[in-house]
A protein has these predicted regions:
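Alpha-helical bundle segments that constitute or directly flank the non-heme di-iron/ferroxidase center
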Residues: 1-28, 49-61
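Short amphipathic alpha-helical/adjacent loop interface patches that line ligand
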Residues: 10, 14, 99, 141
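Non-transmembrane alpha-helical segments in soluble domains
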Residues: 7, 18-21, 44, 48, ...
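N-terminal start-of-chain detector that recognizes signal peptides
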Residues: 2-4, 15-17, 32-34, 65-66, ...
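Amphipathic, non-membrane alpha-helical segments in soluble helical-bundle scaffolds
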Residues: 3-11, 37, 41, 88-92, ...
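Short, contiguous alpha-helical
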Residues: 27-74, 117-172
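Acidic/histidine-rich alpha-helical segments that form the ligand environment
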Residues: 76-118, 128, 132-140, 147
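Short acidic/polar alpha-helix capping motifs at helix-coil junctions
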Residues: 6-9, 21-23, 66-67, 83-84, ...
Length: 172
C-alpha cells in the first residue's frame, strides 16, 4: 500500500463534493435527517464528524497504544443534530478545511510500511491494522461520493422513463 496513492484520493474528495453540491439553487434531498436514508447534506456532515473523531484519532491510537486501547465507538448519526441550521456550502467549507488539515497530519506522521502492519482494536470489528484503517478511509470516501450521486439522481427516477433500465444508480 502506498500512502501517496491514498492521499491523492483523500485530497480530491472535497473537490469532488464541491463540484457536485456547492451553490446548487435547487437542492434535492440535501438532508432528510433519517438514519435509514441519508441525503447529501447528511453525508457531508458525517464526513466532517469522521474527520474530527475517527481517522486521524484512530491512527494515533494505533501508533501510540497498539491494540491495548480500543477505539472510541464512532457515532454514525451525530451529524443529524450537530449540523442543523447550517447551509450545504458551510458544510463543504468545513469539510475542505478539516480534510486538508488531516491529510497534512497524515503526511507529517511519516508512516512506514512496518507501521501499516500495527494493530488496533475496533470496538465492533475486533483487530484491525493501521493499513486497513487508512485504506478504509479512502473507500469510505468513495462510498459516500457514490451515495451523494445517488441522492442527486433519485429525484429524476420517474422522469427518465424507460431509460431507467440503463441507469442502475436509480435502483440502489
Amino acid at each position: 500500500m502506498k500512502l501517496d496513492a491514498l492521499t491523492e484520493v483523500l485530497e480530491r474528495t472535497p473537490e469532488t463534493l464541491n463540484a457536485l453540491l456547492r451553490g446548487l439553487k435547487h437542492e434535492p434531498r440535501l438532508g432528510v435527517g433519517d438514519e435509514e436514508e441519508w441525503g447529501p447534506f447528511d453525508v457531508v456532515g458525517h464526513l466532517i464528524f469522521g474527520e474530527e473523531t475517527d481517522w486521524i484519532p484512530r491512527a494515533r491510537i494505533i501508533l501510540e497504544h497498539g491494540d491495548s486501547r480500543p477505539f472510541v465507538p464512532f457515532d454514525r448519526f451525530a451529524q443529524f443534530e450537530r449540523f442543523k441550521g447550517r447551509s450545504m456550502d458551510e458544510l463543504l467549507g468545513m469539510f475542505e478545511e478539516a480534510r486538508a488539515a488531516n491529510v497534512e497530519t497524515l503526511r507529517e506522521m511519516g508512516i512506514t510500511a512496518e507501521q501499516l502492519l500495527l494493530r488496533g482494536m475496533h470496538p465492533e470489528l475486533g483487530p484491525v491494522t493501521l493499513g486497513q484503517l487508512l485504506a478504509t478511509w479512502v473507500v469510505h470516501d468513495l462510498n459516500h461520493v457514490a451515495q451523494v450521486a445517488e441522492g442527486l439522481a433519485k429525484p429524476h427516477d420517474a422522469a427518465v422513463g424507460s431509460w431507467k433500465a440503463y441507469l442502475p444508480i436509480l435502483d440502489r
